[in-house]
Amino acid sequence: MKLSLTIVSSSFLVAIAHAASVQFNLIAPSATDVKVSVNGQQVALTASDPNVPYFTGSAEVGGTEESFERSLAGITNSTFNDFYNRPVTYANLPQLPWPIENDPQWTRKGKKAEIFDDNYIPSVFFHGDDSQVQDLVKNVPKDKVTGTLTFIGSNYVHSFANVSFGIHGAGKKHNNAKQSWKWTLSGTDTMGNRNHFKLRHMEEDPTQIRERLYADILHAMGTYANETTMVRLFINGQGFGTFNMLDDITEFSYINAMFYGGNPPATLGPLFDGASGADFIYHPGNLDGYSSWKPNKDNANGEGYEAFDPLCKAWNETDYTDNTAIANFEKMFDTEHFLRFMVIEYLTAHWDGYWMGQTNDGAYRDPSDNNKWYFLDQDFDATFGVNLDVPENKDFISVSYKDFPSRYPAGVMANGLLQNADKKAKFEQYLTETVRVLFNNVTLTNRVLAIHNFLSPDLEWDRSIVQQSPGTNFGWTFEQTSQNLWQGVSAPNNNGGGAEWGLVEYIAAKSQAMAKEFNITIVSEPVGPPAANGTATSTNDGGNTHTAAGESKPASSSESSGSKIASQSVSGASRSAVSTVLLGVTALVATAIF
């Protein structure tokens, strides 16, 4: 069962010239008394659900014109869902360019779901039986807890009942104390065309940016990579920190959303999770040789890893140098997007992925595309120099992709394609153009720094939380979330954690190495996606495809089923965390009173 609150907001706003009743919306964990002060008159905000600290209320404001714009006008007269003590509610992140000219974007997913709007940090509140939740947190069993879940986005609220909530990867030997989580919605409930979500703790990465950034790049490359965004998680009223909310590619929820836009065929194809050894190597007479491909339990007719035998046999028998033979194989396997994935695996030194490690991949056979196989990629935290254990150490950035087939011979799909002159030329074209416009210390660093500045207040909150579960705690500090942008850092608890490279340091070094090898002239200003006139936009000012905090943004309708109840809009005022919250408003100016 799901309830949704959605309010349509105006697409653009200038200063209001008349008095209006404005609805204020505030997320204030631990607050017991929330008020807004309008020209000195206090108006109380209230929370309708005692388990969700989401406070709303209306107040009359005057029509004095201001020298700046506010998103309080138009149809809604409502603020965005502000989070207490966060200076920016809705950001203005620079968007990445599209390096590939032909089929530049993956369109089968439809419009990007509003829940993955990267300019806003949603808040997730799960509430379940206290004794079961305590057991889940303290003892980390594989059990699931059923309860209610509220997802608060920029200008909407989704609430769900009968949600199955638990630890992702429970029972693994080296889990972090900050666990990863997952939840599944019940029945026909969906959010953004999905019913299953994964929250990754990002503890391997002090910046908490790498995995999200990797997915950002893959989307700019026109792939069907999982969608991601940062969220705040609260369980039974307690804050558990910041997490990367993303699709789990091993679940049909991801397939339904990214391949079919929420309208899947009556019967889906088989889906597989690639564990260590998922390499596409042919095993004649030994079907168990494909056992590293773990079938989804809901595969139609229980189809298992034996499904890979015809595919791997065909690849083994293909003359890689023959374009006709490659074209015939492409009727079975999508090489186009696979090459795009491999470009980014190479550029980021994704040692825990397919090419270098033959792991953390997956595959889906699409019945709506003549049963063609699609490669899936996942788990992007071990990238951009994190835990990179190679003989060359930092000199690894200069290792050419041309050396990868001999270094990593089990990556037979990538290695075979590079034996074909046309595929090798295409790979190199994608690689060099990506470095020229995107993967460099100009465009990509511009986005990294914008993301970091936006996330920083939440990272400070996250680093202040004492996790309650058993497991590894590297002890990364708030200061290291910034320091690891520029240089390597060591885990304060001296128990692992291999952030030897700074994130920006790695991007700059790798792009310079590529520019030297291929004689690439990198752009001098950040580049954005194509504008309506077909030319690339500059994002030197922080991006021009989204509006800044304090401005209005076009509203998007709810994509999930269930009744719509209401909605919210946005504001960028500063807040302060205390048990009693008092917001000061003079006319349309929302400021914090300390």
Curated annotation (Swiss-Prot):
**Biological process GO terms, please?**
adhesion of symbiont to host endothelial cell; symbiont entry into host
Q: What superkingdom heads the lineage? A: Eukaryota
Q: Where does the record say carbohydrate is attached?
A: N77, N162, N226, N316, N441, N519, N533
Start-end of Polar residues biased regions: 534-547
**What does induction of this protein depend on?**
Expressed during growth in host lung and brain, and during growth in presence of epithelial cells. Induced in presence of high free iron (at protein level). Induced during growth in high glucose (at protein level). Induced in presence of 3-hydroxybutyric acid (BHB) (at protein level).
Proregion positions: 572-594
Q: Which UniProt keywords apply?
A: Cell membrane, Glycoprotein, GPI-anchor, Lipoprotein, Membrane, Signal, Virulence
Q: Where is the lipid attached (GPI-anchor amidated serine)?
A: S571
Endpoints of the signal sequence:
1-19
State the practical use.
Answer: Antibodies against CotH2 protects mice from mucormycosis, and thus could potentially be used to treat the disease.
GO molecular function terms noted in the UniProt entry = host cell surface receptor binding
Which ranges are annotated Low complexity under compositional bias? Answer: 548-565
Where the protein is mainly located, per its record? membrane
What this chain does, per the entry, is described as: Promotes invasion of host epithelial cells by adhering to receptors on the host cell surface to facilitate endocytosis of the pathogen into host cells. Binds HSPA5/BiP protein on the cell surface of host epithelial cells.
What name does this protein carry?
A: Invasin CotH2
Originating species: Rhizopus delemar (strain RA 99-880 / ATCC MYA-4621 / FGSC 9543 / NRRL 43880) (Mucormycosis agent)
Taxonomy, top ranks, is: Eukaryota, Fungi, Fungi incertae sedis, Mucoromycota, Mucoromycotina
